[in-house]
Amino acid sequence: MTELFIDGAWRDGAGPVFASRNPGTGEPVWEGAGASADDVERAVASARRAFAAWSALDLDARCAIVKRFAALLVERKEALATMIGRETGKPLWEARTEVASMAAKVDVSIAAYHERTGERRSPTADGVAVLRHRPHGVVAVFGPYNFPGHLPNGHIVPALIAGNTVVFKPSELAPGVARATVEIWRDAGLPAGVLNLVQGEKDTGVALANHRQIDGLFFTGSSDTGTLLHRQFGGRPEIVLALEMGGNNPLVVADVEDIDAAVHHAIQSAFLSAGQRCTCARRILVPRGAFGDRFLERFADVASRITADVYDADPQPFMGAVISARAASRLVAAQAKLLELGAAPIIEMRQRDPALGFVNASILDVTPVRELPDEEHFGPLAQIVRYTDLDDAIARANDTAFGLSAGLLADDETVWNTFRRAIRAGIVNWNRPTNGASSAAPFGGAGRSGNHRPSAYYAADYCAYPMASVESAQLQMPANLSPGLHF
């Protein structure tokens, strides 16, 4: 099967054969040969050849192609959503939302380019000062499996608008979504070599990351892999590296009047996308006392009735399967470790079928655990931490090396103002789920959640570098010479 897209054509890979499966049914979705090191070499060379013409193309012409891509996404929304659902297990309602987000990203990215990296002119005494922005060159984009369309799209779209060319290495767990997306780019009229697709597993990613002819690498994925990339590019300041990684995110619940609203936002924060969003709440901090007890009782009641089913089930479930049976078993193992450390089960996670990715939403009270591991468990595993007062809640919330998202559910704005000033995270929400983020704002975190290159609206910043010029249309001698010069 021809599954690599290099220099505007579909090609056979020379690497190992691998496959993706629907985690909710086990059925095969995609199979093909990955890219070998030689295939990666050809992809990078193709992007390098295409760079001069693409970057020289008028910005409006580049944007016209990108807008055509958005229009085709709308036309093919159902087909792409179905592929996302089949390959990731997420319900169709959520897959459709992902495709809609991909299309909406285009106008937002164009606006961000003009606002953050456009051209500025200001008069000076001797001419005009001009600020322009230039593309880096060839950039590698590494995509994750949880949003296999939307998240790499958040790097690719602004990179292309800025004039870069791209080599895209998707997750080996979602190659079918990547192929379908690249087909849409091809049909939108993107010139040959501007976007290249190299499918593959770890060896393909290593070959691309190690290539000496890339000018940048944009990564979304785990903190462990991102940290390895950061070490790898140490001593290479010429490479622009943008890392979007995970978090051990806290949601603090205060004593609120509308307990059902608090429970709803906690459910969304912890269990949306089966807990497979990097902004999901991993720790839910609940006050000690009667209110906290009532909240936990209601939270457990609603969580116990969350439906999980195949992507196209009717009626639609809230959750689908996690990405694989292996991921499901790792979550159950993580729960077992926490129980061994002294956590008290409120709802225990169980894997429905060892061959599939279905697990239920689970809740553990980890307050008794003396040394709680600072880890991101990428699934529907909510850890409850009881606190005494706001200072205690903030201290516990900040007790992490990560800093992606955090949230507060509270009626009192004074409490919110105290919280937002003290919390250490890049996305901090009040009376909204932790995984709610605006595309018109930056998306990124502090600590081990990234390397201070936020994406979304600020992706324009790492897709181009500033070029400052002082210009005069006429060459002439200055009115006054510097001391010691004689003409």
From Swiss-Prot:
Keyword NAD in annotation: yes
Keywords (A to Z) from UniProt: Arginine metabolism, NAD, Oxidoreductase
Pfam families: Aldedh
Active site: E244, C278
Record-level GO BP terms: arginine catabolic process to glutamate; arginine catabolic process to succinate
Chemical reaction(s) catalysed: N-succinyl-L-glutamate 5-semialdehyde + NAD(+) + H2O = N-succinyl-L-glutamate + NADH + 2 H(+)
Pathway(s) where this gene product acts: Amino-acid degradation; L-arginine degradation via AST pathway; L-glutamate and succinate from L-arginine: step 4/5
Function noted in UniProt: Catalyzes the NAD-dependent reduction of succinylglutamate semialdehyde into succinylglutamate.
Protein's UniProt name: N-succinylglutamate 5-semialdehyde dehydrogenase
Organism of derivation: Burkholderia pseudomallei (strain K96243)
